[in-house]
């Protein structure tokens, strides 16, 4: 699901 945060999103959106 695209709504669930992945490690990439967490790292980029930190």
From Swiss-Prot:
Subcellular localization(s) per the UniProt record: Secreted, Cell wall
Keywords: Cell wall, Secreted
GO cellular component: extracellular region
Main location: secreted
Record-given protein name: 33 kDa cell wall protein
Organism: Arabidopsis thaliana (Mouse-ear cress)
